[in-house]
Amino acid sequence: MNTPETFDFKFYEWEEKFRDKPFLKQPFGDEWEIYTWGEVGQYARKLATGLRSLGLRENAHIGLISKNCREWIIADLAIVMAGYISVPFFPNLTSGEINTLLTFGDVDLLFAGKVEDWEEQKAGVPEGMPIISFPTYKGCSDITEGHQWFDFINQHEPLQEPHKPKLSDVWTIIFTSGTTGNPKGVVLDYLANQSTAELTLDTNALKIDFNGNNTFFSYLPLNHIAERVVVEYAVFRFGGTLSFAENLDTFAKNLQETQPTVFFAVPRIWTKFQMGILSKIPQEKLSKLLKIPVLSWILKRKFNKALGLSKARSIVS
């Protein structure tokens, strides 16, 4: 049995406890497709078996290029189960940037998914590198190279004995954006995650429900360490559901339907929210209304409900 120190151990606990409860929620137009904790566990185990069948080296580096989606989470979990190291990238890289990072990251296999210009990007993938492609999403590229997601998963049985990482093992390599020069890979071990978990448990600054009653919404790039820890790692570690935005046009609708209990945002998102509010109420009038305590309280509640934040216990920026 693994020690209760790495996030995969907690995933197995939630999987057992919440086997038939919703975990990953993916929007498709007006509909949401839901994977339960049990289904995600089975998909990840089958994928892990498939990865091991490819004869990769020990501690192989597995690249991942895709916008946020359920397959991203399953692939990341399978990489851990198989005993490999994830190397995620921004989904909008050019072919030259992809080639550079695949080389710097010493990547052995690439998951390619929800991207918009694969025809240009694939030129940066070294010849002969194995590829596993996600299902095609509306508005994104149809990737026909390599192993197809469901075909590959369904060829394999669930991995019976997933890898049991130690705190000192490398978990992931996160590349910087490279805006100030060549991108640099930051190597993180499982201890980094455990330290975050301990801090959350001690302070509960995120107002997490430790019984698994949490709702997360993922839209910022998962290859960025902040989204990876505050959203992906948090749901693995503390339980709940994780929903995604379908695209930029549906962001507001998807957020409103999700009503997350923990919401992580960057300044440009707040600017977008502000512009939406000011398009309905002029700044001068809004400022006057917010100075009246009762009206201020009512307006803030209405704004939060309209934005999809009425159930948010914690808003992080």
Model-derived features with residue positions:
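Conserved pre-ATP/AMP-binding loop-to-beta segment of ANL
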Residues: 22, 154-175, 182, 208-215
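Conserved AMP-binding/adenylate-forming core of the ANL superfamily
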Residues: 23-69, 73, 77, 94-99, ...
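Conserved AMP-binding/adenylation subdomain of ANL enzymes
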Residues: 194-218, 222-311
